[in-house]
Amino acid sequence: MKKIAIFGSRHKSEQGASIKALILKLEEAGTPLYIERKFLSFLEQDLDFHPAICGVIDTLPEHIDYVICMGGDGTFLRTAHQIGVSQIPVLGVNTGRLGFLTDVDCHEASELITRLLDGDFTIETRSLLEVTEDNGSSPSYALNEAAILKRETGSMIRVNACLNDDYLAAYDADGLVVATPSGSTAYSLSGNGPIIMPACRNFVLTPIAPHSLNMRPLVVPDDTAIRLEVDSRSRNYLLVLDGRTRTLPCDTSILLKRAPHTLRMIRLRPHSFAETLRRKLMWGAAVR
């Protein structure tokens, strides 16, 4: 029997019935369940629901076969961070607002979950960013983007960028986003970056509020090594990986490249990225 770990976030009470229906369907199938501690607290305290589980988890155990993430895109990114290099397949169940990264909506999940249990699904791989600081720390990973941002609100920072050790430009801006195809519909998009189809092997460099009008988003192959060095009046800057923030001194440079592993996303039904754009981003809609 496949073992499933469930991660989630606190939800609105009207979604409680759908959440319980999904977990009960897994219980009825005899699925060994491991539930994240904070999410289990929500189930027990807010929904008065006490599922039969094999264990309470804070991090993802190695023996898990599948991961179910119940939440929005923020919860999905947090779960992807938990999965790390293990490449355990993850199913996203949307209980948030947009749910661009998730596969199914909460109200339909209990009907579709038998496909997961029967092995009737496909796997879609998503590329990740590997981010290494030159201070000797271990690499970190991001599904959507790595953002270099100013720490103080009053002045810009300068981000010097090199591609494969070839100098590109100095970005005088509020920051610079390096996004994967998955992240091209997130922070990068708000900076007028292009939307990149998930199967494309590219990264996009998108400046945030650049000082110069001729600093535009740039698409590069994902086998490019991107080195970033920062100059700032505050002597520090922010490194943000999928919403996880660290403060670094300006003498710390960053190397970004494609990670050697991918994120494996479970698809319970045929998936069309074009349909997702139309449905969730109102792509091409005549809004008047």
UniProtKB/Swiss-Prot annotation:
InterPro entries: ATP-NAD_kinase_N, ATP-NAD_kinase_PpnK-typ_C, NAD/diacylglycerol_kinase_sf, NADK. Pfam families: NAD_kinase (PF01513), NAD_kinase_C (PF20143). The keyword Iron-sulfur does not apply. GO terms for biological process: NAD metabolic process; NADP biosynthetic process. GO terms for molecular function: ATP binding; metal ion binding; NAD binding; NAD+ kinase activity. Its main location: cytoplasm. The active site is at D73. SUPFAM superfamilies: NAD kinase/diacylglycerol kinase-like. GO terms for cellular component: cytoplasm. It catalyses: NAD(+) + ATP = ADP + NADP(+) + H(+). The keyword Secreted does not apply. Its cofactor is a divalent metal cation. NAD(+) binds at D73, G74, R78, N144, E145, D174, T185, A186, Y187, S188, L189, S190, A209. Its EC number is 2.7.1.23. It is found in: Cytoplasm. Keywords: ATP-binding, Cytoplasm, Kinase, NAD, NADP, Nucleotide-binding, Transferase. It comes from the Bacteria. Belongs to the NAD kinase family. Involved in the regulation of the intracellular balance of NAD and NADP, and is a key enzyme in the biosynthesis of NADP. Catalyzes specifically the phosphorylation on 2'-hydroxyl of the adenosine moiety of NAD to yield NADP. NCBIfam families: PRK01911.1. This is NAD kinase. It comes from Porphyromonas gingivalis (strain ATCC 33277 / DSM 20709 / CIP 103683 / JCM 12257 / NCTC 11834 / 2561).
